[in-house]
Amino acid sequence: MNLFQNAKFFTTVNHLKDLPDTPLEIAFVGRSNAGKSSAINTLTNHVRLAYVSKTPGRTQHINFFELQNGNFMVDLPGYGYAQVPEAVRAHWVNLLGDYLRHRKQLIGLVLIMDARHPLKELDIRMLDFFHTTGRPVHILLSKADKLSKNEQIKTLSQVKKLLKPYSDRQNISVQLFSSLKKQGIDEANRTVGSWFDAADAAASSPEEN
């Protein structure tokens, strides 16, 4: 079953006080222009569920989409885009950081990286920051179609090697993904679906004395 199929827009939020009361959430984040909106549209089989723009930094709020299992997917503002006023950028940073740090409903993070330029400084900082929450991270190496098959294999291997210190301390997984070629949809579904399954199992299990 495609977990993301038939996802529906729910609401958009610009302040933490306006966050909706939801069951469980998984969030999508990435550098501006890493292909986050295209990845969301591909996973949900929607043409324009998430706004795709040639202008980096277009996603400026926290957007909520309801999944068919009743839980939520959250599209967070992209990071690393400097061509906005300082006050706006500071607001994005605070909004993003406070949501990731304090949102109790959040069970995992999908981090989008351009397969041609993975693990940039801000991506590493995001991994370090999110590590403190103890929640899993799944990395989509987007735009994989821009690489040859050999380059894809080499890139995935290199990224896994570089992530080894992080995967030793927290649950981190990584895969290749292409919105253009519809590559990696099933793998992303399985990984994120397992997060919801684990959260449901933990919630239904009796507390130990």
From Swiss-Prot:
Mg(2+) binds at residues 37, 59. The keyword Kinase does not apply. Pfam families: MMR_HSR1 (PF01926). GO terms for biological process: division septum assembly. Keywords: Cell cycle, Cell division, GTP-binding, Magnesium, Metal-binding, Nucleotide-binding, Septation. Its cofactor is Mg(2+). Transmembrane segments: none annotated. Residues 22-198 form the EngB-type G domain. One of its GO terms (molecular function) is GTP binding. InterPro entries: G_ENGB_dom (IPR030393), GTP-bd (IPR006073), GTP-bd_ribosome_bio_YsxC (IPR019987), P-loop_NTPase (IPR027417). One of its GO terms (cellular component) is cytosol. Necessary for normal cell division and for the maintenance of normal septation. NCBIfam families: GTPase_YsxC. HAMAP family: GTPase_EngB. PANTHER family: ENGB-TYPE G DOMAIN-CONTAINING PROTEIN, MSS1/TRME-RELATED GTP-BINDING PROTEIN. Belongs to the TRAFAC class TrmE-Era-EngA-EngB-Septin-like GTPase superfamily. EngB GTPase family. This is Probable GTP-binding protein EngB. It comes from Neisseria gonorrhoeae (strain NCCP11945). The lineage of its organism: Bacteria, Pseudomonadati, Pseudomonadota, Betaproteobacteria, Neisseriales.
